Amino acid sequence: MCTAVNFQTGSHHFFGRNLDLEISYGEQVVVTPRNYPFHFRQVAPLTHHYALIGMGIVVDNYPLYFDATNEKGLSMAGLNYPGNADYKALATDKANVTPFEFIPWVLGQAASIAEAKQLLTKLNLVKINFSDDLPLSPLHWLIGDTHSATSLVVECDKDGLHVYDNPVGVLTNNPSFDKQLFNLNNYRSVSPRVQENSFQPATALNDYSRGLGSHFLPGGMDSMSRFVKVAFTKLNAPHSATPLEQVTDFFHILHSVEQPKNLDEVAPNQFEYTIYSSCVDADQGIYYYTTYTNNQINAVKLHNVDLDQAKLTTYALADQQTVNYQN
């Protein structure tokens, strides 16, 4: 399972996610320059497009992005959506895009949510595997840009494609986004502040602990619990003064729902855990990340790469723990 966050603070916009799985696929930071030719299975190729940076794997010289941001600050992340995602057959009047092409197809062409929405009006997410060894994953997507604090959720269900405006700027997994959003109604009394005694004011009920306003905030590893908790954390997060402080704030939001090993068994002796957490400064094109085995924040700068070349640039993850010994 996974968690994604869209966060605007001051003049900076941040977008990122936790990738929660039981195995690593050899993720790396991948920069796709403007002249790398994106070839698609059913639609016209993009031979010149916006440059991208994100996390993914490269197979047969093709970037399979888990999350990415383009040079204009438009960002996307794909999250697990099992049992609900329903990809379609080819349609003659639509842009037939496979899910593994969806991120580059949008980010290669759109500079904003408004432009992405225009592309989505003709989208048909089709069931075409990357290969026999790499079948499609059931996904839904969060999209954010640098122009507003709002974001989009895209889901392809049995009854068709749904594009939701997302007022809270977070996404996890099942159930569908509209149900996740409605579920927040059950937590309208949760607060970062101590609440007045409304149970029975005449009865002495003491604030015996700090944090009682968040007593009913869920803490499970399940996707509905994580949606509520990360929405609460994000919507109450500080708006710090400097970009680096804001990056730190963003990682604290993600880490509020990270998964340690051995707490979420998905198969006998196999446990889901947070493989990496990412945060992109979408205004500056800086991709920050931490990994399960290295809490230090590492960064790759999009604009330090030659963006007019035609070859992918990859960066192996710094996943060995770094300790700053002070004596």
Language model regions located:
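Aromatic- and glycine-enriched pocket-lining scaffold segments that form the walls
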Residues: I113, K117-E155
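A contiguous strand-loop segment
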Residues: C2-K94, K127, A318, N324-N327
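Short, surface-exposed beta-strand-loop junctions and turns on beta-sheet-rich folds
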Residues: L21-I23, P82-N84, K158-L161, T293-I297
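A short, polar/proline- and glycine-enriched secondary-structure boundary/capping micro-motif
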Residues: S24-V30, D86-L90, H162-P167, N174-S176, ...
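Short acidic-glycine loop/turn motifs at beta-strand connectors
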Residues: Q8-S11, N70-K72, D145-A149, E155-G160, ...
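Short hydrophobic/aromatic-rich beta-strand segments that constitute the beta-sheet cores
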Residues: M76-G78, V163, Y287-Y289
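C-terminus-biased signal that marks the final domain/tail of proteins
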Residues: C2-V5, H12-F14, I128-N129, L136-S137, ...
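Proteins synthesized as precursors that undergo proteolytic processing into mature forms
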Residues: D93-N129, P243, V247-F251
